[in-house]
């Protein structure tokens, strides 16, 4: 199980990303708009740099909902591979069967 602080850090990153998403999108639109002047581009870039680092959605890491494991997490289930295996063998995920060929 991952440390609780790491799980809470990821939750904080998700909250910050959601909070600053409109502002970040607005600034990126100004930066990408070629009809704006160089001064406006520069001002928007400086303002974007002033936003918190953790408000950037690329810093968010997907973690297992049960264990908090950061690697081997399936997006579809939100669980790590080993927890998917345990739960699937108990038959708790509908429609999921063991592969055989």
Swiss-Prot record:
UniProt-listed Pfam families: Ribosomal_S14 (PF00253)
One GO term describing the cellular component: small ribosomal subunit
Record keyword Iron present: no
One example of a Gene Ontology biological process annotation: translation
Any one GO molecular function term: structural constituent of ribosome
Domain of life: Bacteria
Alphabetical UniProt keywords: Ribonucleoprotein, Ribosomal protein, RNA-binding, rRNA-binding
S-adenosyl-L-methionine as UniProt keyword: no
Similarity annotation: Belongs to the universal ribosomal protein uS14 family.
Protein purpose: Binds 16S rRNA, required for the assembly of 30S particles and may also be responsible for determining the conformation of the 16S rRNA at the A site.
Subunit architecture: Part of the 30S ribosomal subunit. Contacts proteins S3 and S10.
Name assigned to this protein: Small ribosomal subunit protein uS14
Lineage of the species this protein comes from: Bacteria, Pseudomonadati, Pseudomonadota, Betaproteobacteria, Burkholderiales
Gene this chain is encoded by: rpsN
């Amino acid at each position: 199980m991952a440390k609780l602080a790491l799980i809470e850090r990821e939750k904080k990153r998700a909250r910050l990303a959601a909070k600053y998403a409109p502002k970040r999108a607005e600034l990126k639109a100004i930066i990408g708009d070629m009809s704006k002047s160089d001064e406006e581009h520069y001002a928007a870039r400086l303002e974007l740099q002033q936003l918190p680092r953790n408000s950037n959605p690329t810093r968010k890491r997907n973690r297992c909902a049960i264990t908090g494991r950061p690697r081997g997490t399936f997006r579809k289930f939100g669980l790590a591979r080993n927890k998917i295996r345990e739960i699937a063998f108990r038959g708790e995920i509908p429609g999921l069967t063991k592969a055989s060929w």
